[in-house]
């Protein structure tokens, strides 16, 4: 897919630093090394598509009614095979963190943050640290709102049932999904799409995961 941002509701550009990039035409994923695929320097192996001056390019889709009309369970089912309850029940207690708790730096594999059940309005903050790596990514499921700040580096999938806000200068190598808005960013987020298992990166070892992670975590 050549989509950087996909939203069911409206979208707007805030901040001079906003920009999206795609791999240049004629260059396949297989032409690049793993290091090049994960490089967050837009001057390397990428072409500018969207920015504040030019507006949204072809890689930004918003107002998609199929997303706007989807329930939280519909969206969840596009990325995970088990239901939320089933997945929660498969995780050991060490992988279930209370609402508002932060994932420890250095963590890999799958974590559920928040209670099992109806989406929570409790905010979880991840401020700094490194979570996940290319050979053992993290799958973070936050039942509630999530704020990512500082110079956090996360490799893997982030799934938020509530609202997502970004401050600071975090780097995320993977994908971010949020069931509810509005979602906002006042910092400088570096988001490098990493498909893990379908577009040139090998299937990772997701510790304690019952999730299916092909292609774009799941092509839909």
Name each model-derived stretch.
Residues 1-220:
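Primarily marks folded extracellular/lumenal domains of secretory and cell-surface proteins
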């Amino acid at each position: 897919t050549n989509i950087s941002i996909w939203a069911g509701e409206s979208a707007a550009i805030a901040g001079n630093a906003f920009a999206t990039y795609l791999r240049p035409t004629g260059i396949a994923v297989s032409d690049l090394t793993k290091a090049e695929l994960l490089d967050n320097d837009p001057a390397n192996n990428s072409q500018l598509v969207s920015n504040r001056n030019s507006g949204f390019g072809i890689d930004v889709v918003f107002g998609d009614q199929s997303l706007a009309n989807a329930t939280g369970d519909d969206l969840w089912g596009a990325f995970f095979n088990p239901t939320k309850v089933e997945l929660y029940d498969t995780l050991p207690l060490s992988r279930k963190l209370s609402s508002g708790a932060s994932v420890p730096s250095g963590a890999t594999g799958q974590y559920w943050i928040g209670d099992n059940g109806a989406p929570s309005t409790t905010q979880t903050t991840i401020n700094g640290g490194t979570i996940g790596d290319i050979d053992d990514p993290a799958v973070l499921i936050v039942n509630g709102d999530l704020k990512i700040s500082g110079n956090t580096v996360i490799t893997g999938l982030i799934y938020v049932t509530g609202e997502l806000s970004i401050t600071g200068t975090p780097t995320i190598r993977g994908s971010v999904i949020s069931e509810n808005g509005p979602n906002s960013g006042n910092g400088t987020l570096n988001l490098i799409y990493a498909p893990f298992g379908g577009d040139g990166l090998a299937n990772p070892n997701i510790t304690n995961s019952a999730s299916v992670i092909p292609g774009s975590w799941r092509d839909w």
